[in-house]
Amino acid sequence: MPTIHRPRMGSLAYSPRKRAKSPVPKYHAWPAYQGEPALQGFAGYKVGMTHVIMVDDHAHSPNEGKDIMVPVTVIEVPDMRVAAIRVYRHDTYGNHVLTEVWADSFDKELSRRLNLSKNYKREEAEKKIREALEADKIVDVVALTYTRPSVLTGVPKKVPDLMETRIDGGSMTERFEYGLSMLGKDFDIRSLFKVGQYTDVTAITKGKGTQGPVKRWGVHLRKRKHSRGKKERHVGTLGPWTPHHVRWQVPMMGQMGYHQRTEFNKRLLKIGEDGAEITPEGGFINYGEVRARYVLIKGSVPGPSKRLVRIRHAMRLGEHKIREPTIGFISLESKQG
């Protein structure tokens, strides 16, 4: 058997492993879209996990056509609202915000998050954007959307979470006109996603604070005579003599968890309206009852309960096709143990 060389477990691509700047995840890329202008993402709050019994509809699967048990994550997704339209221009240094067009009505919920300038004039902002569109200087159009946690009982917060959601489809002018038509209006997840569709989910993972190299990087415990130095949960070496400093690749203690992570190709199994049909006996642990619209995502989702989860169309879809699953049973057994 060959010698196993494993200086660490975990990718260095995620370095530096530090705390996320915000509990609201940010998307830096969106999948290609062809069609009429439409919003490209949604957000909800993680409730917890349960399991369902469904028919395995994957072709050539050993259990094709048979009932299988599938773990699912419940995400509560009340309607979101469009607060503003933001456009980007491009120069030598990258994309920059040109200006924003805000809705005429500034509701009480959003006023908890930010204050609109008293000197703001919507007509001037629209005129500036239209002139830039005619000059072909606009490279992207996004909507500033926000959640409404005040309608939920499981999330103890009233301040909405504000985020950018891309508008795609058609020309830049068509996207901008679509955004103007959505200002101040609500939209729900049913207008963006279909049951059986594959999605990408993004959230901030559970925070675990400062951890040592054994738990953080999976290095081996020091054994036999190496442990006689009264240090067992330490890395064996900090590096070579030269260069005369500790390199960043050396597995060391530090922050673990509370990082932004994206999981690809998570299948959306159900969009439900009645929370009672999914709430287990005694409610979900650390959350309670589901009262608003919800979705079932196959498998796990990053983060603890009550954490904001963003959903977008799958970027690495491959050959997956949209097939509405056949769910025969949803477990309502108590999660209290």
Curated annotation (Swiss-Prot):
GO molecular function ontology, one term from the record: structural constituent of ribosome
PROSITE patterns, per the entry: RIBOSOMAL_L3
GO biological process terms, semicolon-separated: translation
UniProt xrefs under SUPFAM superfamilies: Translation proteins
Keyword RNA-binding: yes
Keywords: Ribonucleoprotein, Ribosomal protein, RNA-binding, rRNA-binding
Domain of life: Archaea
Subunit composition and interactions: Part of the 50S ribosomal subunit. Forms a cluster with proteins L14 and L24e.
Family under the similarity heading: Belongs to the universal ribosomal protein uL3 family.
Protein task: One of the primary rRNA binding proteins, it binds directly near the 3'-end of the 23S rRNA, where it nucleates assembly of the 50S subunit.
Protein name: Large ribosomal subunit protein uL3
Gene (name only): rpl3
